[in-house]
Amino acid sequence: MYPLLETINSPADLRRLPRAQLKALADELRAFVLDSVSKTGGHLSSNLGTVELTVALHYVFNTPEDRLVWDVGHQTYPHKILTGRRDRMGSLRQFGGLSGFPRRDESPYDTFGTAHSSTSISAALGMALAAHQQGEDRHAVAIIGDGAMSAGMAFEALNNAGVHDDCKLLVVLNDNDMSISPPVGALNRYLAQLMSGRFYASAKNVGKQVLRVAPPLLELAKRLEAHAKGMVVPATLFENFGFNYIGPIDGHDLESLIPTLENIKHLKGPQFLHVVTKKGQGYKLAEADPVAYHGPGKFDPAMGLQKSSAPAKRTFTQVFGQWLCDMAEQDKRLVGITPAMREGSGMVEFHKRFPGRYHDVGIAEQHAVTFAAGMACEGLKPVVAIYSTFLQRGYDQLIHDVALQNLPVVFALDRAGLVGADGATHAGAYDIPFLRCIPNMSVACPADENECRKLLSSAFEQNHPVAVRYPRGAGAGVEPEPGLQPLPFGKGEIRREGSGVAILAFGTLLYPALQAAEKLGVTVVNMRWAKPLDTELLLKVAASHEALVTLEEGAIMGGAGSAVGEALQAAGLGKPLLQLGLKDEFIEHGDPAKLLALQGLDAAGIEAAVMARFGSVLQPEKSGKPAKPALKSVA
């Protein structure tokens, strides 16, 4: 089925192929990617768009000696297939299987781990300068998309790289006019002008002449260097950064890509190659709707994505999106902000209904946070919809620009906790620890969809910054009540009365805690707020129970359990305390339910942990053991 591809077990095999066979190989590679992703789920559109570019890079450069650094990394399936992992693609994004992103511990061809955007140029520059310092003759190539190029970090790296005339650095701009959502901002308009301007047609023709009427390589390299500015718009933005800019060229045309890359290898100083690709290339359904096919689940390629006949549970993202529209209808001060995650964060409907109050700032989390702060200074009520893992990138702005000035910005933190197939790079494991230590900041942890809507309303009515964290996907299936009624600020509730031990649940783990409690006979408290902690309720529960257990889908170290321990200590209460949450480790990709079970955070794991630590204080009929004297404090 894949006669050429099955002969390629490494890029060395690829480089032994005659150039005339590369087009056929690319076709097989694209078909293999489509077949693989349709069976496992994963990123599709971006990978179909990078097939020829991947083939060309591995064909021209001596990988892994020459370093390829893939920005974001979700477009690396062709790269993985060509670098000896073809037979493992059936395990993609599954527990114990291939990662959906580059990982240094997975292959020597994955020279730098990526998953968050805009890091590739910095890493590749570091590699290029390290090679130069150590006297090693190798290239470093950063492959970055036009969406990722909009981030400040990419421009910081360009600014630094442009002064190093002695490094062998190539930046390949993969211009597919898409990030996850369509890219926005002045840079995108600038690239569009390069593509559509009157100069482009003649530039492209000059480029073809230089490439096809080819003298010997050394002479051609000199001509390319001399004529580079004649191939594109003069004094481009990237040339002003100190790069030699070449392009745009067709990123699906191997006859253009390979000679261009071969010639660039002989040029001195930092090089910038602008290639134009199409997301979903070669699969008509993905070409027509690259957003829908950005990260599909399993599907039949012949039929395409199909809507499920079974009614789907409402996701937390959808609950947020509906709340945002409803609150915007009621309060004209509300503005919605997203760093390039309109679809992922549930803001499509808000954008349609309130276009003048919707702001997609691009992949620019630092800017998004301070932009929101500026709006709050002028009396608006900004809501920043952002994944928990991406808020990490705007941490200084969170402290310096929002919290220090005590500005009323709401942070809707999607993908809090484990995220499943995307793995450690996307896990929202750290938001409670890094948020609760900031003065003026509050953190809400809804247990279900109804609480999510109400706690968003609670957050919105505050005059200081508040984050509401909620997980990916659906929850317990509790239908949100209509209206915009808030829950009391900083207050929890007792959900189940028991004895001996009380489980203090923060967020959606309330429901497995309730399941475990039915067998254990213990009390369950829905804490709702990691900050401010409901200390009144906490001390009341502590006084009437012999031991406490905290439960959170987040890092144990510094998390909500730590907050409970601090509060008990401040009150002078020595109370046995068991903290359950995510362990001090990076948690691999896999099925979310399996990952929670492995962390001991499903109902069975919670029951086992409580029994192991506090079985002696449970009712004899629950523990299966004779009653024992009360525990002494270990706090």
Swiss-Prot record:
<dbReference type="GO" id="GO:0005829">
    <property type="term" value="C:cytosol"/>
</dbReference>
<feature type="binding site">
    <location>
        <position position="176"/>
    </location>
    <ligand>
        <name>Mg(2+)</name>
    </ligand>
</feature>
<dbReference type="InterPro" id="IPR033248">
    <property type="entry name" value="Transketolase_C"/>
</dbReference>
<protein>
    <recommendedName>
        <fullName>1-deoxy-D-xylulose-5-phosphate synthase</fullName>
        <ecNumber>2.2.1.7</ecNumber>
    </recommendedName>
</protein>
<keyword id="KW-0460">Magnesium</keyword>
<dbReference type="GO" id="GO:0008661">
    <property type="term" value="F:1-deoxy-D-xylulose-5-phosphate synthase activity"/>
</dbReference>
<feature type="binding site">
    <location>
        <position position="146"/>
    </location>
    <ligand>
        <name>Mg(2+)</name>
    </ligand>
</feature>
<dbReference type="Pfam" id="PF13292">
    <property type="entry name" value="DXP_synthase_N"/>
</dbReference>
<dbReference type="InterPro" id="IPR009014">
    <property type="entry name" value="Transketo_C/PFOR_II"/>
</dbReference>
<feature type="binding site">
    <location>
        <position position="176"/>
    </location>
    <ligand>
        <name>thiamine diphosphate</name>
    </ligand>
</feature>
<dbReference type="GO" id="GO:0052865">
    <property type="term" value="P:1-deoxy-D-xylulose 5-phosphate biosynthetic process"/>
</dbReference>
<dbReference type="InterPro" id="IPR005477">
    <property type="entry name" value="Dxylulose-5-P_synthase"/>
</dbReference>
<dbReference type="GO" id="GO:0019288">
    <property type="term" value="P:isopentenyl diphosphate biosynthetic process, methylerythritol 4-phosphate pathway"/>
</dbReference>
<keyword id="KW-0784">Thiamine biosynthesis</keyword>
<dbReference type="GO" id="GO:0009228">
    <property type="term" value="P:thiamine biosynthetic process"/>
</dbReference>
<keyword id="KW-0808">Transferase</keyword>
<dbReference type="InterPro" id="IPR020826">
    <property type="entry name" value="Transketolase_BS"/>
</dbReference>
<keyword id="KW-0479">Metal-binding</keyword>
<dbReference type="Pfam" id="PF02779">
    <property type="entry name" value="Transket_pyr"/>
</dbReference>
<dbReference type="InterPro" id="IPR049557">
    <property type="entry name" value="Transketolase_CS"/>
</dbReference>
<dbReference type="InterPro" id="IPR029061">
    <property type="entry name" value="THDP-binding"/>
</dbReference>
<feature type="binding site">
    <location>
        <position position="74"/>
    </location>
    <ligand>
        <name>thiamine diphosphate</name>
    </ligand>
</feature>
<dbReference type="GO" id="GO:0030976">
    <property type="term" value="F:thiamine pyrophosphate binding"/>
</dbReference>
<comment type="similarity">
    <text>Belongs to the transketolase family. DXPS subfamily.</text>
</comment>
<dbReference type="InterPro" id="IPR005475">
    <property type="entry name" value="Transketolase-like_Pyr-bd"/>
</dbReference>
<comment type="subunit">
    <text>Homodimer.</text>
</comment>
<comment type="pathway">
    <text>Metabolic intermediate biosynthesis; 1-deoxy-D-xylulose 5-phosphate biosynthesis; 1-deoxy-D-xylulose 5-phosphate from D-glyceraldehyde 3-phosphate and pyruvate: step 1/1.</text>
</comment>
<comment type="function">
    <text>Catalyzes the acyloin condensation reaction between C atoms 2 and 3 of pyruvate and glyceraldehyde 3-phosphate to yield 1-deoxy-D-xylulose-5-phosphate (DXP).</text>
</comment>
<feature type="binding site">
    <location>
        <begin position="147"/>
        <end position="148"/>
    </location>
    <ligand>
        <name>thiamine diphosphate</name>
    </ligand>
</feature>
<feature type="binding site">
    <location>
        <position position="365"/>
    </location>
    <ligand>
        <name>thiamine diphosphate</name>
    </ligand>
</feature>
<feature type="binding site">
    <location>
        <position position="283"/>
    </location>
    <ligand>
        <name>thiamine diphosphate</name>
    </ligand>
</feature>
<dbReference type="GO" id="GO:0016114">
    <property type="term" value="P:terpenoid biosynthetic process"/>
</dbReference>
<dbReference type="GO" id="GO:0000287">
    <property type="term" value="F:magnesium ion binding"/>
</dbReference>
<feature type="binding site">
    <location>
        <begin position="115"/>
        <end position="117"/>
    </location>
    <ligand>
        <name>thiamine diphosphate</name>
    </ligand>
</feature>
<dbReference type="Pfam" id="PF02780">
    <property type="entry name" value="Transketolase_C"/>
</dbReference>
<keyword id="KW-0786">Thiamine pyrophosphate</keyword>
<keyword id="KW-0414">Isoprene biosynthesis</keyword>
